[in-house]
């Protein structure tokens, strides 16, 4: 049964400072923007939050640019923005590839990278990309700004270090050297929740991150080190299998995830 929205309240800030002040003075509030996940929860009657902060019209959280040779992506950049951005396609093509895999066109037009990250689902398609890219999450409150390495942002299943008075305002991605790679495996070819999702960089400093396998997205430093040493593919696959602890859930089994992850690693290393 769909949940009623009549008992819920929505605050509508006109600027980022206004939003941060509301979080400080009128919280707790749940930030929202594209609402692609919120509406699903509302329709299924599982939405627990009752007070929301509308970020959708805050221009300060939009935009994609380069500052001091660092790619900066506003938290309200939509997946369509990521797909179309020449800067993203040039500097972080694996993020554009991930954005193409998220839902249908309507979800891509409304869903934001900040929402995908804040939702903290281990199956989020952009998460392995940001982990493999050594991205920085920029958090802001009325008291100031914090920059958190993406790999330190998640503390558990759907849990993050973001405080109640903070907003994700941007992501900072340093230059990447090497061939970037992204793949997602789901129940069907499109509009599917990931069973396994991998992003990586093949080069002098290999990088590999995997999602929808453990309670949070993870980097695989032992597998990265094996790739850097130049061992054969089978050995790197063995290292990967020993490094992950896949979960069983309604979407897949641990054994399936283990085998798929190893196969995807082989495809990444072969350039497929």
Describe the residue ranges of each PLM region.
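C-terminal structural segment of proteins
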Residues: 1-272
């Amino acid at each position: 049964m769909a949940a009623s929205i009549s008992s819920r309240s929505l605050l509508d800030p006109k600027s980022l400072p206004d939003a941060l002040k509301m979080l400080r003075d009128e919280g707790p509030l749940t930030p929202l923007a594209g609402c692609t996940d919120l509406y699903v929860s509302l329709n299924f009657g599982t939405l627990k939050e009752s007070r929301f902060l509308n970020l959708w019209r805050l221009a300060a959280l939009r935009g994609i640019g380069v500052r001091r040779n660092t790619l900066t992506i506003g938290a309200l950049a939509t997946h369509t923005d990521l797909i179309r951005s020449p800067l993203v396609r040039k500097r972080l093509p694996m993020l554009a590839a991930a954005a193409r895999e998220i839902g249908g066109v309507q979800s891509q037009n409304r869903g934001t990278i900040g929402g995908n990250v804040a939702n903290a689902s281990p199956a989020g398609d952009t998460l392995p990309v940001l982990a493999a890219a050594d991205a920085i999450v920029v958090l802001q409150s009325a008291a100031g700004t914090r920059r958190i390495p993406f790999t330190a942002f998640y503390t558990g299943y759907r849990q993050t270090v973001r405080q109640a008075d903070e907003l994700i305002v941007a992501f900072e991605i340093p230059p990447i050297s090497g061939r970037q790679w992204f793949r997602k495996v789901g129940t069907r070819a499109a509009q599917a929740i990931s069973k396994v999702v991998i992003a990586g960089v093949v080069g002098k400093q290999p990088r590999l991150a995997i999602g929808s396998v453990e309670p949070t997205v993870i980097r695989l430093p032992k597998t990265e080190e094996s790739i850097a040493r130049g061992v054969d593919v089978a050995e790197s696959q063995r290292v990967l299998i020993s490094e992950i602890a896949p979960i069983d859930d309604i979407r897949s089994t641990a054994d399936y995830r283990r085998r798929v992850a190893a196969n995807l690693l082989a495809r990444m290393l072969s350039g497929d």
